Amino acid sequence: MSECSTATDLARAVQARETTPQALLEAARRRAEAARDLNALISLNDRADEQAARVQVRLDAGETLPLAGVPIVVKDNLNVIGTRTTCGSRILANYVSPYDATAVERLTGAGAVIIGKANMDEFAMGSSTESSAWGPTLNPWDRERVPGGSSGGSAVAVAANLTPVALGSDTGGSVRQPAAFTGIYGLKPTYGRVSRYGLVAYASSLDQIGPFARSAADLALLMNVLAGHDPRDATSLDAPPAFRPGTPDDLQGLRVGVIREALEGNTPGVEAALNATLDALRGAGATVREVSVPSVQHAIAAYYLIATPEASSNLARYDGMVYGERVSAPDAVSSMTLTREQGFGREVKRRIMLGTYALSSGYYDAYYSKAMKVRRLIAQDFARAFGNVDVLVTPTSPFPAFRRGEKTQDPLAMYAADVDTVAINLAGLPALSVPAGFERVDGVRLPVGVQLIAPPLQDERLVALAGGLEGIGAVRMEVAPAS
């Protein structure tokens, strides 16, 4: 069995008694130790051996488990019982979760073994995984560059083969952009398709948990486990999963729309990868046409005037009284002030202040209310576009991974990194970043991604199309160097 085996292959091997959950766990730990310089993981799961042993007991009792023994990491904003959930922030440095997130519960119920928690931008606010209190995560393709964010640790864990699959969260592109920067798949499901129970909130109307993988079969495997209604999440949809990896036949007769507004400002390598993907689709029997979604030009402005007010509200609880590392002071007000001043990083403070301002008296109508109207307009424009095509295509990012420190002092430049992804969250649509090739920058090959977008609840179609693209050789999948 290859060190680069997929989750599908590993689960099959464990079920067939060709290996054991404990052996897979130990191998994953060795890979994680060898790649420590990437800083992909914040912590290891002390209960992983216990989980592996439980999986073995269930197998010995005759159970069939879809993720039997598969090692996986989850982003550090997902609660795992008995482990720290820090969200990449000092204010939660010692918070130990008393329960499992629904997504984690479903993974372990299917036989997966959680080996650790992945690094992330603080409270998922970032596009580079540089704002974590535990230091930046490095891109394995070029350690001088970022892996994207905010789910950079999860993406690197899969790209560098620490684990075959991982979980992240996507509020404005935080699964798809890191997937593009590291050369793997990253799926942002339809809003409500995967339960958010146990996910620490950034912007509740935008957050969605999504998987990283190196094959369409693994995406299908994970989504069949993760998706489905959860009564503990009021926004959870009752849409039973029916995912499959797909074949080239799924591309025959497909109507593809290329979003015109996403064709400007791309680097030559991104443009070449997009054109190669479109040519491959045409060759497989799809029709390709340009379509316009005019309101997407306002998506970044609307996104930050919706996400930051929600963040301001969600993060108000971290004051040291109930949640957060409390800083001692002579009185309660001083303690709360110091707790937030010392516990939050610069970017989190910036977004809290921006959100508070947008919600303040006299500015609500000018900013938040207007942004919500733009959000509805974006959803309507996407719905109109889908009246003529089955799937929309854009670059995932207009450029490959940028250098560490390049955008940290320019927040607007950092925010613009999500120009191709935020509109999808505003509209609640499913979208998948597909590894589409490489661009050589300063002598280094850097991955680039192409984004497939589908109407609501057509997540299955995206995974099937990924399998079809694999079948015609249009997916460029390579394991990144871990050391």
UniProtKB/Swiss-Prot annotation:
InterPro entries, A to Z: Amidase (IPR000120), Amidase_CS (IPR020556), Amidase_dom (IPR023631), AS_sf (IPR036928), GatA (IPR004412)
List of catalytic residues: K75 (charge relay system), S150 (charge relay system), S174 (acyl-ester intermediate)
Cellular component aspect of the GO annotation: glutamyl-tRNA(Gln) amidotransferase complex
GO biological process terms held by the UniProt record: translation
Keyword Thylakoid: no
Reactions catalysed according to its record: L-glutamyl-tRNA(Gln) + L-glutamine + ATP + H2O = L-glutaminyl-tRNA(Gln) + L-glutamate + ADP + phosphate + H(+)
A Pfam family matched in the record: Amidase
NCBIfam families, A to Z: gatA (TIGR00132)
Protein name (record): Glutamyl-tRNA(Gln) amidotransferase subunit A
Organism expressing this protein natively: Deinococcus geothermalis (strain DSM 11300 / CIP 105573 / AG-3a)
Gene label: gatA
